[in-house]
Amino acid sequence: MLKKSYLVAVLLPVAMNWCALAHAFTDGTDHSATLEKVEQTFVVQMDGSNRLDVDSVLLINEERAIKASAQRPVSYNRSLETLDVIEAYTQKPDGRKVMVDAAHIKEQQEQASAQAPMFQDSVNKVIIFPEVAVGDRLVLRYQRNRFTPLFPGQFEDITVPEFHPVGQFTLIYDMPEGMPLQADARNFKASLPAAAPGRKVYRWDYVPADRARIEASAVSYLDYGHYLAVSTFTDFKAFAQAYQARAKVEVTAPIRELAQRLTAHLPTTREKALTLSDWVRENIRYVAVYVGAGGVVPHAAQTVLDNRYGDCKDHVALLEALLTAAGIKSTPALINLGNAYVFPKVPALGVLNHVITYVPSLDLYLDSTDPSIAAGYLPLAVLNKRVLLTATGEFGRTPAIQLNKVSSDLQFKVKGDGGADFTNVATVQGWASEVSRYGVKSMKPADRDLLVEKVLGAYGQRGSGTFEVRPSNANGDFVSTVDGRTENLVNLPGPVGMVALSSLAGGISQNVYSFAMEKERSQRFVCISNDTVEKSRFEFPPEVSVLAIPKQVRLQDANVEYSAQYAQEGNAVVIERHFKFSRPDVVCSPEDFAAMKPAIEAMVRDLQSQIIVQAS
């Protein structure tokens, strides 16, 4: 879920040198440790309950692996399963074993559920290995017994090898003969070992191969990388039916009264749906427990309402109950929360880790879990994604494009000593307006007071100022004003170059440099449509002469429109830049990047251009 404030785009600068960018096609393997052995064996029963035995050996190759591996958390859900550590020890190069005693196996609450009693069954058992040094092997054997299956009579699992050198990585599934297992395997070799009567054993061994570094903004490794997904579900429709059977909601009298109170005065179905979703967003605290880890059965809608918190499926359950009370039909929609855009070939929860709400009559998707995204918009992480509608078993797709416009007007009044007074007015329209508003509300007063100083400091400027937010207008736009002073905008007397800023922070620079984070690309990457206009004006005193201004730039390709205009008006320099990135998708290919690269390079050069001035 997108939790970082969009204020970054309006207030924080980004600087980067194209020539210093990372290169694609580099090895992504982490050689600090080696997975010498990982063997996972599931023994599954007809009701879906199962036992997992894990036997692993990790070799520490480098010092940095000690901190990452000396404490090994293993998660489980106490309401669904038990977890027992069979054996754990540090094995020294001479063969000596330093055992992990019971005092060094600790249970910790999952961070997301620590303040949420309904989810306190989600815990980590942390194994603390003793005396770990380079050259040691960390040996761990544990057993997890799932006595309550997520879906009665079904089983599914997904595994992704870690980015370490791999010796043996084996997955074994011992199944009842009457529970055929389907698989989606990438870089895993299948075999069928001997099995006991009435059983069938499936085995997959990982075939090690080079794995490229995951590039900046790349889609999830699950979209293209090595993994094994297995499932007893015959198809996604059966998977949807199994989820729906466990996600029934009840409309209680308090829920009905609340829905009526919130919507009775509203004239349209859409207004009612948006109002109810916003109420859940603003009043039900979200607990970030993924589908699967916290089970698949939502708490009763009334319980969620009473407790005022819940995970994604609880949000959906309460919103569905409220919508039903208002006469609006809806369905849960299973989706990936993250940067995975490809469904596995077999139904498995590893990718479908989130659920949102779909209103068929309005063709409207709602996600009330992100407190910073107003109803009618969606978090970026769920845009243009395939969803599984559990009420019908059909597939749907979330919108790819939503309003996203930013404009800013920046004015500097430069003094003879090189300092300057400045004012910046920024307007955010669309999905990011509420994100920005929420970000301001969430800031500590002390942080807000220092915001302008920190922004200036990122440019190497010394100064301060005030940051104010105007009341929302009828369109819900976010409008902010920054007034301040910098002591060292330009290093006079010169002649000297000063960066031709068109906004105080973020904006076009952030968008362009996000594209420029890689010099080459071999993986698909996330690219969100947006439209930004920036104007700036530098007024110089009479004793400062403007010697040169940058040349105008105009660029256009299939996805990018960019222009930069520079004009001298008396002793002032006026800059206007416009950047528009638009495409019907939110994922770009390496070929798209190659086509955009000339424009990206030209935009970077323009953003680094300078105004040359000199004081008499």
What is the meaning of each model-derived region?
Residues 1-5:
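Positively charged n-region of N-terminal signal peptides that target proteins for export
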Residues 8-20:
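Bacterial N-terminal signal peptides
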Residues 23-616:
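A sensor for short, sequence-defined functional sites
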